Amino acid sequence: MKFGIEFVPNEPIEKIVKLVKLAEDVGFEYAWITDHYNNKNVYETLALIAEGTETIKLGPGVTNPYVRSPAITASAIATLDELSNGRATLGIGPGDKATFDALGIEWVKPVSTIRDAIAMMRTLLAGEKTESGAQLMGVKAVQEKIPIYMGAQGPMMLKTAGEISDGALINASNPKDFEAAVPLIKEGAESAGKSLSDIDVAAYTCCSIDEDSAAAANAAKIVVAFIAAGSPPPVFERHGLPADTGAKFGELLGKGDFGGAIGAVDDALMEAFSVVGTPDEFIPKIEALGEMGVTQYVAGSPIGPDKEKSIKLLGEVIASF
């Protein structure tokens, strides 16, 4: 099992750099930085992380081909690869329709858009010209092939991830979700003459770890509420939860009733949408994900009640694998 960690760049960048360095020191192999217009710029953040670290692989987790053109992303990730001496990884997904609506961006043909974007970026990163004549001139990646991970959720995206990417970043925390997702990734990989073992299947989890299990759970409840609000009915059905659960949380959060939303998060929702607990409780949960085909565990928001302490505790977990 490989281990990654996600940070949202909404804190001072100096703090994020220190936390990523700590993660590197305790054994994390990947750092994923979210890319959203209302936070700090992902590539400027990554550049400073590259300067402050030595071995950890790093990249956006995830960008999209609507807000940033594939050519701009290719240039940015090649520059990051140069700055980090060959440690760049690229996470790209279809994005969030609600965000695009707020920005006045039309969200059309996500599967074909992702497919075309990855093809263009691979061409540019190889130093070649695209059919329309675009070519990177003043920047060249250190790696011969920068790994490209696809953020994927739905069946078509999961199959496409298996077909054209090096890894799949899946927003899920429960083995049941990977029991459904991994066969689709495998199908896509085999359609392209690859095998499932060629794909790094990453569980992008809602993670909260602490020496106090209850404190860990409490820190994750607001994140679980937002995950529930954004999940479609089939996900709830998979976990034996009422199909209208998402609508209920959407209503609570929509009117700003965060306390009500937190209070409505029960044990079944926590089990479905998070990995929480003490280090001893974490180990079997990560092992269960591995049994379903997960090859990278990503510790996502909130990480824990105290990020620095929680990263050190995750280091204890990593040492068990």
From Swiss-Prot:
Keywords: Cytoplasm, Methanogenesis, One-carbon metabolism, Oxidoreductase. It is found in: Cytoplasm. The keyword Lipid biosynthesis does not apply. One of its GO terms (biological process) is methanogenesis, from carbon dioxide. Induction: Increase in abundance from the earliest stages of exponential growth, reaching a maximum level at the mid-exponential growth phase. CDD domains: Tetrahydromethanopterin_reductase (cd01097). The keyword Repressor does not apply. Optimum pH is 7. Catalyzes the reversible reduction of methylene-H(4)MPT to methyl-H(4)MPT. Belongs to the mer family. Oxygen-stable. This is 5,10-methylenetetrahydromethanopterin reductase. It comes from Methanothermobacter thermautotrophicus (strain ATCC 29096 / DSM 1053 / JCM 10044 / NBRC 100330 / Delta H).
